[in-house]
């Protein structure tokens, strides 16, 4: 069994930056969730908010990595209108029975991240070994490193226990 897989969706790049940081620091595989249509511009923003509010699970491309092959799956999503992104909702719906241990993170421009992390855990049907919510402004200023170190230490600690 492989140690860890980081799976994320990112529309603006914030969640991608965090996911790649975690994967690099933890020596984990990293896989973006790919969807069938783009979310660019105002219409992409509007569509994202509408799907999040409706809690839609949309069509996504098949994953190349099987979460069942990993001891830990780290899931990352942006906060959209106070909810997890619809691509992440679709990924969890498709793979939640394949998860062993999970860790969760979210990025946000505003608020709602803690609620999103609880919703993700409930939707996965298990308690995460670690969670963290990062503000886009923290990421822009490079202030997210300390929170990520604590996040990764928490899931590494749970692995040793």
Task: Label every model-predicted segment.
Residues 1-3, 27, 99, 125-128:
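A generic structural signal for alpha->beta connector loops
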Residues 103-143:
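Short, glycine-/small-residue-rich phosphate/pyrophosphate-handling segment
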Residues 34-36, 80, 105, 133-134:
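Residue-level "edge-of-site" marker
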Residues 78-81, 109:
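Short glycine-rich anion-binding loops that position phosphate/pyrophosphate groups of nucleotides
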Residues 75-76, 104:
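Redox-cofactor binding/interface segments in oxidoreductases and associated redox assembly factors
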Residues 1-75, 82-89, 93, 146-161:
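N-terminal beta1-alpha1-beta2 submodule of the flavodoxin-like/Rossmannoid cofactor-binding fold
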Residues 85-89, 99, 117:
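Generic internal hydrophobic packing segments that stabilize the cores of diverse globular domains
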Residues 67, 93-100, 123-126:
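Short, conserved loop/helix-junction motifs that constitute active-site signature segments
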């Amino acid at each position: 069994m492989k140690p860890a897989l980081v799976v994320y969706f990112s529309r603006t790049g914030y969640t991608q930056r965090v996911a790649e940081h975690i994967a690099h620091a933890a020596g984990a595989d990293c896989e973006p969730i790919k969807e069938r249509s783009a979310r660019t511009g105002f219409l992409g923003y509007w569509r994202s908010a509408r799907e999040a509010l409706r809690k839609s699970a949309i069509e996504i491309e098949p994953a190349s990595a099987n979460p069942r092959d990993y001891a830990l799956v780290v899931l990352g999503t942006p906060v959209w209108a106070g909810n997890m992104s619809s691509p992440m909702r679709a990924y969890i719906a498709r793979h939640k029975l394949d998860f062993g241990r999970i860790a969760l993170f979210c990025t946000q421009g505003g608020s709602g991240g803690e609620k999103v992390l609880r919703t993700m855990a409930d939707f996965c049907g298990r308690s995460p070994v670690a969670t963290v919510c990062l503000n886009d402004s923290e990421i822009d200023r490079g202030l997210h490193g300390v929170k990520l170190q604590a996040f990764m230490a928490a899931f590494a600690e749970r692995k040793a226990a």
